[in-house]
């Protein structure tokens, strides 16, 4: 058993009873590529293997820690379904391409949850579905709805329906983190955007939520709000992702959306 590296945010699960429902929630089908983020000791990888063995499914297990990558290479060297990738997930995701449906899952390091979520949305092939174990407070924020929306919930829910599946107590991890976790499921909506437009939309939402407790006449001009048919007395958390997207389209005439 390798010692966890604190700088990599490593906290490991050991019970199949927790990770098996994550794999089941992904709804794996033939002809799909599965990306596993941070396999560590391989507990999730092993369950994935049992679910996909003998099927037309490819699993990419992406691990940044050389120790675990070597261990997994040894475990799955003769298994054609599993490809172990020794890479930083934030550098690898933008390079991944596929002509098949893509799904993603993993127990994410809490300290890079937001960058990973953003990277998933900006992938060349946006995943059909994602199942992640993340910090409970962040999970609740990602799944929040108007009038309690946030920047991250609005951004993610423009492209995905977000559902909190179940909580995972911190005592289920080794070493135990300071906070509890929760598993979320993201299911693709019909919204289509290229990466460049997504980044512009991301900047637009950052502007909108730069003063979350202020009314919308703070980040936007009277003319902009009037053009979008937006009540200037509302606050950013009052609008749904659909309303934000329509407002963005009006202001940017985004024909590519």
What is each PLM-predicted segment?
Residues 188, 207-257:
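C-terminal lobe and adjacent flexible extensions of AdoMet/dcAdoMet transferase-like proteins
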Residues 1-203, 207, 245-246, 256-257:
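Catalytic cores of RNA-modifying enzymes
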């Amino acid at each position: 058993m390798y010692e966890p590296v604190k700088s990599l945010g490593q906290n490991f699960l050991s019970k199949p009873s927790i990770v098996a429902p994550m794999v089941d929630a992904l709804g794996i089908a033939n002809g799909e590529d599965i990306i596993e983020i941070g396999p560590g000791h391989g507990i999730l990888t092993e369950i994935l293997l049992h679910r996909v063995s003998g099927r037309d499914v490819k699993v990419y297990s992406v691990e940044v820690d050389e120790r675990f990558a070597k261990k997994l290479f040894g475990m799955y060297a003769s298994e054609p379904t599993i490809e172990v990738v020794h890479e930083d997930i934030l550098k690898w995701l933008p390079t991944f391409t596929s002509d098949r449906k893509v799904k993603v899952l993993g127990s994410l390091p809490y300290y890079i949850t937001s960058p990973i979520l953003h990277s998933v949305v900006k992938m060349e092939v946006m995943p059909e579905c994602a199942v992640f174990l993340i910090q409970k407070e962040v999970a609740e924020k990602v799944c929040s709805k108007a009038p309690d929306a946030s920047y991250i919930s609005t951004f993610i829910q423009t492209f995905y329906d977000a559902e909190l599946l179940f909580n995972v107590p911190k005592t289920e991890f080794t070493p135990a983190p300071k906070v509890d976790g929760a598993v979320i499921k993201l299911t693709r909506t019909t919204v289509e955007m290229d990466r460049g437009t997504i980044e512009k939309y991301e900047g637009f939402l950052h502007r909108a939520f730069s003063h979350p407790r202020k009314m919308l006449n703070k980040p936007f001009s009277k003319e902009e709000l009037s053009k979008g048919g937006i009540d200037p007395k509302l606050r950013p958390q009052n609008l749904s992702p659909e309303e934000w997207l329509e407002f963005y389209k009006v202001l940017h005439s985004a024909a590519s959306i």
